[in-house]
Amino acid sequence: MSLFTLFALAVALGTDAFSLCIGIGIAGVNRRQIALISLTVLIFHILMPLLGWYAGGFLGSKMGQAASIAGALLLLYLGGKMIWDTIKPGKDEGPRFVITNTGGLLLLSASVSMDALSVGFTLGTQQVSLVLAAGVIGLVAGMMTFAGLTLGKYVGDWIGERAELVGGIILVGIGVKLFF
């Protein structure tokens, strides 16, 4: 596998994180949260191909489907919460971080990196260094996560009061898409 092909694969695997993080960024995140989410997604995108490589097809098919469903439900919840927080009376005006605990952060990271788990199964059949591939996939996904969160944050500032509604709609849309 050429380096160009590996990079293209990494970009394709990072698009879920990028688009999801635009929606999260719109809700309002600070620099620390951007760094934490980006680093966690980066780590998951390194570990998942390695896990896929070693775990085998059976585990991946079972865990992949359950994690996709859990991830879709999380996105629907987060998106619905963001929409509700926008339209409910008496809302506060400060930025909201929609992932409020470690479990949510880990589930988010796992849900956007499930494709990397599947890719790990197939990387073993290619002429590529697994460590190099996992590193490239992780770095690209981390950078795309950072870019999505940052873009969402500034788009959110620009849109103003209804930015969270837009972010919620994006998250619900991605959550629904994961079911199909």
Swiss-Prot record:
Q: Membrane-crossing residues?
A: 6-26, 34-54, 67-87, 103-123, 130-150, 159-179
Highest taxon of the lineage:
Bacteria
Subcellular locations according to the entry: Cell membrane
Q: List the disulfide bonds.
A: none
Give the chief site where it resides.
Answer: membrane
| One Gene Ontology cellular component | plasma membrane
This protein's record includes keyword Transport: yes
**InterPro entries recorded:** Mntp/YtaF, Put_MntP
Matching PANTHER family, A to Z?
MANGANESE EFFLUX PUMP MNTP-RELATED
The record's family statement is: Belongs to the MntP (TC 9.B.29) family.
The protein's name in its UniProt record = Putative manganese efflux pump MntP
Q: What is the lineage of its organism?
A: Bacteria, Bacillati, Bacillota, Clostridia, Eubacteriales
